[in-house]
């Protein structure tokens, strides 16, 4: 929180205590945290079907677990990020930061204990083992999530958001996602978290984005931003 018109005195006191603790013991705290985190990351590299992801430049405190090309043991259907998110929460009482089509993001901090990280690691291995029992390793077997792209393509900007709002007077209508391709949006569309828009007012909706949104809906994700579920408001004559 950088600024607020309604400051929380509990939060402010907590921030003061955090500053004091880091000033007095910061080096010690982060040294211990780094050891725990490095150990956890090394152990998670042993997952067989789920994978701990990393890039050239990454924040090591965030554990990104990919479930791409895995299937659920009971249904033989694709096992997606939302299912891993719900599994961790409902069965293991572990709260992930967010879920997407292919992955979940798990936040860690110096406040996490060795016992807490051990709970997480054990839960992930237990889930992975269940998948393993029903999913033998096969190099030629691809189980991609149809319609989901890890990076969304940019839409064609037709109007600015302000101009799109001004165009409302010329007529609007609501269409189902199946009929949205090529139409100019008047609403934001996004998944939360992370809250990054898939569609912005004034953009022409692409076929790939429609496919992506329908795939997310099929996996049980809530599409935010639109007034009516399963529909989006568009310009009537565009």
Can you name each region flagged by the protein language model?
Residues 133, 237-238:
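Generic C-terminal helix-cap and adjacent flexible tail
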Residues 1-71:
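Active-site C-terminal subdomain of aminotransferase-like
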Residues 45-204, 211-225:
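Conserved C-terminal alpha-helix-loop-beta "cap" of PLP-dependent enzymes
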Residues 6, 209, 227:
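Solvent-exposed, flexible loop/coil residues
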Residues 226-237:
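Terminal helix/beta-alpha structural elements that buttress the NAD(P)+-binding lobe
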């Amino acid at each position: 929180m950088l600024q607020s018109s309604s400051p929380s005195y509990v939060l402010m006191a907590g921030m003061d205590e955090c500053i004091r603790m880091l000033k007095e013991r910061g080096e010690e705290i982060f040294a211990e945290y780094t050891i725990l985190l490095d150990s956890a990351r090394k152990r998670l590299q042993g997952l067989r079907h789920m994978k701990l992801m990393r890039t050239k430049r990454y924040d090591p405190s965030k554990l990104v677990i990919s479930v791409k090309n895995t299937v659920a043991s009971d249904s033989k259907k694709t096992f997606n990020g939302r299912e891993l998110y719900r599994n961790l929460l409902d069965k293991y009482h572990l709260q992930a930061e967010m879920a997407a089509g292919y992955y979940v993001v798990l936040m860690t901090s110096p406040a996490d204990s060795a016992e807490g990280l051990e709970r997480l690691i054990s839960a992930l291995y237990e889930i992975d083992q269940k998948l393993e029992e029903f999913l033998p390793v096969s190099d030629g077997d691809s189980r991609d999530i149809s319609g989901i792209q890890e990076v969304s393509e940019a839409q064609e900007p037709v109007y600015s958001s302000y101009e799109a709002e001004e165009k409302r007077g010329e007529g609007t209508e609501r269409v189902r996602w199946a009929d949205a391709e090529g139409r100019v949006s008047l609403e934001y569309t996004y998944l939360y978290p992370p809250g990054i828009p898939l569609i912005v007012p004034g953009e022409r909706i692409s076929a790939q984005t429609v496919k992506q949104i329908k795939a997310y809906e099929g996996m049980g994700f809530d599409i935010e931003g639109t007034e009516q579920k399963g529909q989006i408001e568009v310009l009537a004559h565009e």
